[in-house]
């Protein structure tokens, strides 16, 4: 039994992969030590996507055509998961993401699964928390380069607006380095809180 693991072992978001990779390796070692599944041992094929969507697609295609994996664990981040989820569905290869929260990763796909909550769940919960804290206005600072950030921002904005909060929106991209002008704009509108739905 071959299981492919597609994850960012290196790059900007590699810290998210450590727990996933080590967790998979630990469980596979445990299963194999107990005799495998129906007497068959599990072989892991682990590849580094570097957190890049196109690299994840290339790895997925190789794992299916050359490595002949039976299951994919990954991707870790939403953008790369979105890039391979449709491929998994078409190939009818089960894919499980431990941490991709974008709703569209699994939507309408019966071969794609997640073991975590979704962007709407997080965004709504955060907006409700802002209401509980009795904030009247919140600035949302969104990284438009990230599917994760955009999904969370939209869910937060929808719920916070329903709850009567005033929303101030500012956007940036992953390449931005100077936030002085954006933060000056936000400061000028005097929000009671700032919501930054992004990777740390």
List PLM regions with ranges:
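Loop/turn elements at helix/coil->beta-strand transitions in domains of secreted/extracellular proteins
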Residues: 1, 39-43, 66-71, 90-94, ...
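Short beta-strand segments enriched in small/hydrophobic residues
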Residues: 1-19, 75-76, 137-143
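Second-shell loop/turn segments in exported
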Residues: 9-15, 46-49, 69-71, 110-116, ...
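Beta-alpha junction/loop-to-helix N-cap segments that form part of ligand/metal-binding clefts
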Residues: 15-22, 34-106, 115, 174-179, ...
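Short, well-ordered amphipathic alpha-helical segments that serve as non-catalytic structural scaffolds
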Residues: 23-31
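Amphipathic, non-transmembrane alpha-helical secondary structure
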Residues: 25, 54-65, 82, 124-132, ...
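An alpha-beta-alpha
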Residues: 112-174, 193
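Short, intrinsically disordered, charge-balanced linker/junction segments flanking boundaries
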Residues: 192-200
